[in-house]
Amino acid sequence: MEVQKIWKSFLNAISKVFSKGKKLRCTCFPKRKKEASERSCFPFLDTETISSCDLSDDVLSPKLFAKNSYRCSLKETKCIDVIVSHNSLAPQFTEIRYTDGISAKAENTDEMTMHIALAPLTENQ
């Protein structure tokens, strides 16, 4: 399935940034808090991937009202923000952008876009 290939490309891009064995913490910020769930955050990830990632539905993102934001942090050193624009049920992305210049792209995507920004974490993040 094409969507699963896109998600694998997405996960591979993240794994290149974070070394193996370290835990990736992911928080979902849906438009409405009651929609928060593992399925709404990562609908096409298998259980093996989900088990290696802490998923929670804490609070609404104050700066993103029409989009979902997936913030993944590795300890207190770096932060990945995945911003997903919803135009379709299928989660797709065209480009992953990191602040250090690393980028990854996926083909055949026109419904949804993800942008990942890699930046140091501050105390109030």
Curated annotation (Swiss-Prot):
Keywords: Golgi apparatus, Meiosis. Its main location: Golgi. It is found in: Golgi apparatus. One of its GO terms (biological process) is meiotic cell cycle. Has a role in meiosis. GO terms for cellular component: Golgi apparatus. This is Meiotically up-regulated gene 112 protein.
